[in-house]
Amino acid sequence: MLRHVLVNTAVALLVVALLSAPAAQSRLLDPEVYESGSLREPFSFEDEVCGLHVQVEGELNERYEILAVPGSSGQAFQERRRYSYRKAITNPATGRTMSVSGRGYFREVHATHVEGDIWELIAVETGSPFVVRDAKGRVVLADRGVMLTRSVQDTLGDGRPSSQELEHELTKTLGAFPSLADDFDYCALVSRLIG
């Protein structure tokens, strides 16, 4: 009888330990939210695009979180950002208009300490970050899918999310990203739509 009680107690303690260990570890490794917020920014300005004087009007919307990387002593940060934007580009000389819009979710998913204040960050961006429409609203070009990027950042050792980017590369795409093609000519597209 005593042996039965001891075995059951040992099994119960083992189960509790196994179930609580991952929860305790995940709490220790959960990133601390340094800052979060949202932004809604309408804009209107004159610009020069591909040699054309244009009027640009639109809006940017974002929700973001800046997270302290666990184990970095508050020196490295990762970003999560949901965004959408739209802008109408009008050529006053011709009265022709085109629009550019995008919507996506950007998140830095992995941080590796390189040395000193230098960190490597791996990011994933999903969605439709770049969509071009003609004056009638027809899609003439659309990027969509997943982009993986790698960057190396100098965090400057100041305990703030600002950093200096030392390297940045697009490592992989999944989906359709015609604007990234070697032969893509944005200026030719602009000229065709509003020139």
Regions found by a protein language model. Give the residues of each.
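Secretory targeting and sorting signals
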Residues: 1-25
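Beta-strand-enriched cores of mature, soluble protein domains
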Residues: 26-195
